Amino acid sequence: MQSGTHWRVLGLCLLSVGVWGQDGNEEMGGITQTPYKVSISGTTVILTCPQYPGSEILWQHNDKNIGGDEDDKNIGSDEDHLSLKEFSELEQSGYYVCYPRGSKPEDANFYLYLRARVCENCMEMDVMSVATIVIVDICITGGLLLLVYYWSKNRKAKAKPVTRGAGAGGRQRGQNKERPPPVPNPDYEPIRKGQRDLYSGLNQRRI
């Protein structure tokens, strides 16, 4: 790498993909952004070289040539695309660079630092989509909590016993069972005077 080079950072925050560019020309007064394109579909990551149109593109990963016939069948290159099938975050994360055949990787203007997490059923989403899902989930959860609260409150109110006053002509059933029947009553028949039983002489004055 030459002195006076510039590093720049681009991010794909949800996919944890960072891009650093390197400018190899000291005479350039400004910095031009030509980022690598990264697309993820399931467990496949596809990189697109930002420069050298019409040239045969070669790729390196951590200073090692990749994308040739001798490489793994899960890694392949087609024109300016590099396909990484069954991407592994531990083994395939790192620096990537593309350059035309006949030149050196050190002469490339941009490098890519790639770190991505993939899964078979993953779906790429932007920040607004994630925020919308979170807000909707909070609203639905809050609505369900309110419904449960008011339902339990109404159920408790209906479960309270309702008693009628004496003016309405009724008493509670519990009181009717505990209180004895009024006197006089056939259940309390007086002792006959003609019989001399054990209790025949009790309370004769009142009888």
From Swiss-Prot:
| Chain segments annotated as transmembrane | 127-152
PROSITE patterns found in the cross-reference section: ITAM_1 (PS51055)
Q: Signal peptide: which range, if any?
A: 1-22
**InterPro entries for the chain:** CD3_esu/gsu/dsu (IPR015484), Ig-like_dom_sf (IPR036179), Ig-like_fold (IPR013783), Ig_sub2 (IPR003598), Phos_immunorcpt_sig_ITAM (IPR003110)
Q: Where is this region: Disordered?
A: 161-207
Topology with respect to the bilayer: Single-pass type I membrane protein
Q: Which residues carry this modification: Phosphotyrosine?
A: 188, 199
Q: Which residues lie on this side of the membrane: Extracellular?
A: 23-126
Task: Name the CDD domains for this protein.
Answer: IgC1_CD3_epsilon (cd07692)
| Protein species of origin | Homo sapiens (Human)
Arranged from A to Z, the UniProt key words for this protein are: Adaptive immunity, Cell membrane, Disulfide bond, Immunity, Immunoglobulin domain, Membrane, Phosphoprotein, Receptor, Signal, Transmembrane, Transmembrane helix
Instruction: Map out region (Proline-rich sequence) in residue numbers.
Output: 179-186
PTM summary: Phosphorylated on Tyr residues after T-cell receptor triggering by LCK in association with CD4/CD8.
What does the record list as GO biological process?
adaptive immune response; alpha-beta T cell activation; apoptotic signaling pathway; calcium-mediated signaling; CD4-positive, alpha-beta T cell proliferation; cell surface receptor protein tyrosine kinase signaling pathway; cell surface receptor signaling pathway; cerebellum development
Gene Ontology MF term list: identical protein binding; protein kinase binding; SH3 domain binding; signaling receptor complex adaptor activity; T cell receptor binding; transmembrane signaling receptor activity
Its annotated function is as follows: Part of the TCR-CD3 complex present on T-lymphocyte cell surface that plays an essential role in adaptive immune response. When antigen presenting cells (APCs) activate T-cell receptor (TCR), TCR-mediated signals are transmitted across the cell membrane by the CD3 chains CD3D, CD3E, CD3G and CD3Z. All CD3 chains contain immunoreceptor tyrosine-based activation motifs (ITAMs) in their cytoplasmic domain. Upon TCR engagement, these motifs become phosphorylated by Src family protein tyrosine kinases LCK and FYN, resulting in the activation of downstream signaling pathways.
User: What is this protein's name?
Assistant: T-cell surface glycoprotein CD3 epsilon chain
Q: Which disease is it linked to?
A: Immunodeficiency 18: An autosomal recessive primary immunodeficiency characterized by onset in infancy or early childhood of recurrent infections. The severity is variable, encompassing both a mild immunodeficiency and severe combined immunodeficiency (SCID), resulting in early death without bone marrow transplantation in some patients. Immunologic work-up of the IMD18 SCID patients shows a T cell-negative, B cell-positive, natural killer (NK) cell-positive phenotype, whereas T-cell development is not impaired in the mild form of IMD18.
Which stretches does the entry tag as region NUMB-binding region?
175-192
Location in the cell: Cell membrane
Q: How does it assemble?
A: The TCR-CD3 complex is composed of a CD3D/CD3E and a CD3G/CD3E heterodimers that preferentially associate with TCRalpha and TCRbeta, respectively, to form TCRalpha/CD3E/CD3G and TCRbeta/CD3G/CD3E trimers. In turn, the hexamer interacts with CD3Z homodimer to form the TCR-CD3 complex. Alternatively, TCRalpha and TCRbeta can be replaced by TCRgamma and TCRdelta. Interacts with CD6. Interacts (via Proline-rich sequence) with NCK1; the interaction is ligand dependent but independent of tyrosine kinase activation.
The record places domain ITAM at 178-205
S-S bridge residues: 49-98
